């Protein structure tokens, strides 16, 4: 009985250790230029910026949303968690917007590093990147429900 108890306890400890070292889901954040007057925005206002329904920030600066390539983990997170849709639906939206309104999608850059550099250089820029990539050159924008 003691041996069976010890074996069961050892199995639980190994299972707990295995889960502790397992892969963690990467975290992503929205970033803006350090001069941006907002510390947070709600999802609908962020959506208006990225879907080009609003072209300027309230203080007058041109809004410059920046996208990462299709199927990037950060873009998948942004589409699902912030816009509450899929990447494919966003692409369909832009096909329709180009055809009906002549509106182009956000600038697409090849990497999170490029997005961060662009946000740091442009007062009206907004992008999403892995949280681990944030440094003092940009400001994290909190997403309100």
Tell me the role of every PLM-derived stretch:
Residues 1-8:
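Bacterial N-terminal signal peptides that target proteins for export
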Residues 21-145:
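Exported/periplasmic ABC-transporter solute-binding proteins
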Residues 11-20:
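Hydrophobic h-region of N-terminal signal peptides that target proteins for export
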């Amino acid at each position: 009985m003691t041996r069976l108890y010890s074996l069961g306890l050892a199995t639980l400890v190994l299972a707990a250790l295995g889960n502790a070292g397992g892969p963690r889901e990467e975290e992503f954040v929205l970033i803006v230029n350090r001069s941006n007057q907002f510390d947070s925005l709600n999802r609908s206002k962020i959506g208006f910026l990225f879907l080009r329904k609003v072209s300027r920030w309230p203080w007058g600066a041109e809004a410059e949303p920046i996208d990462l390539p299709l199927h990037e983990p950060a873009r998948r997170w942004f589409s699902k968690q912030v816009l509450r849709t899929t990447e494919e639906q966003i692409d369909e939206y832009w096909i329709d917007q180009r055809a009906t309104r002549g509106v182009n999608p956000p600038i697409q850059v090849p990497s999170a590093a490029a997005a961060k550099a662009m946000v740091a250089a442009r007062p009206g820029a907004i992008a999403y990147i892995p949280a681990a990539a944030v440094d003092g050159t940009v400001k994290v924008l909190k997403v309100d429900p």
